[in-house]
Amino acid sequence: MTHPLIPEILDLAVPLAADLNLEVVGAVFHTHLNPPVLRVDIRNLSADTSLEDCERMSHRLETALDAADLVAGTYVLEVSSPGISRLLSSDREFVSFRGFSVIVRTREPIAGQREWVGNLVQRDEEFVYLNQKGRAISIPRHLVTQVQLNEKRS
């Protein structure tokens, strides 16, 4: 069932996307998560959708949503595209996708597991930090083989 705010959110998002030569292809509000996550999927009308497209749309939509005061309380805004590579590698991607659900794979087991799922907190020189349902997880960066956006929410 579609969240009741989605039509109003789309009314704001569609013209903003059009101004950026983008199209809104979907929106969903995951209110069962803490904090709730508003995900808006976009695509570029004239080229492959880039991380920069998502960032530009995210900034514009965040400003519009704040001004309209549609969503009460704290929430996370995710702007994404099915065409974006789901692997994170650059520092910029780790900053842009903070708060997103990720899967971290390691070359050696840590506490008996080689795959960790949680919300990305940050990456520094030594660790990748996740929030796993309120629990802080620090994974040594030298053991990390892959960090991938998670299509399924944790």
Curated annotation (Swiss-Prot):
Protein localization: Cytoplasm
Main location: cytoplasm
Superkingdom assignment: Bacteria
SUPFAM superfamilies the record matches: YhbC-like, C-terminal domain, YhbC-like, N-terminal domain
Cellular component aspect of the GO annotation: cytosol
One Pfam family of this chain: DUF150_C
Biological process, per Gene Ontology: ribosomal small subunit assembly; translation
UniProt keyword annotations, A-Z: Cytoplasm, Ribosome biogenesis
Similarity annotation: Belongs to the RimP family.
Physiological role: Required for maturation of 30S ribosomal subunits.
HAMAP family noted in UniProt: RimP
Protein's UniProt name: Ribosome maturation factor RimP
